[in-house]
Amino acid sequence: QEPGDFMSLTFSAVLFDVDGTIVNSAPVIMGAFRSTLSDFGLEIPDDQRLRTYVGPPLWYSFGDLGYSGQLRADLVSRYRERYMDHYLDPEPFDGVRDLLWDLHHAGVPLATATSKQTPMAIAQMEHLGLADAFDVIAGATPDPGSSKTTVIHEAIARLGAMGADVSHPVIVGDSIWDVRGGHEAGIPVIGVGWGYATEDGLDDAEIVCETVEDLRALLMPAGC
């Protein structure tokens, strides 16, 4: 997509998805799905399908695989155990770490908006040395009703409570879940092309940045 008038906008706060946007976490997430399904003696989908579960809420993913009721709850619980073994392993995509710090130093309010649970998101950002770049680290709750939209609402509310300008927020993400969540929350979406989006997953984003430098040009305040 062409930048068009979107390039002229100034965003008062920026929310970032984590998996597929900040960190390259597909191998760990897909591995946790394989281990979980194997533990229960269930069929393991091929990699192409597993990759579509990098980013969505767990309750959706296991439901999409055809599981419901107590079995789905048990799968979600076991997945979280398996994921805990390796969730600190993924590294940031090239250039993302520097961009986050540069935005922070430029005074741009930053928050995560991730479908992983908040304690894990905090621990991961601390492990990567990025926790202090964010004003707010917001993630999901164990509640099946927790969604990307609810996380975005929470991130914006917490930023606002700190005194940040949240009049023109934007979310940066790599999947259809970020697009849907952002639009359901009433904010624009910047898609990134280095994550795990399906072919048409970012079609409804206001703009797609194929590189970190494209994203930098869009987000950095003038004169920085």
Report residues per predicted region.
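Residue-level detector of anion-binding/catalytic polar loops
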Residues: E43, P109, P188
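N-terminal helical cap/lid subdomain that shapes the substrate entry/recognition surface
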Residues: L9-A106, P119
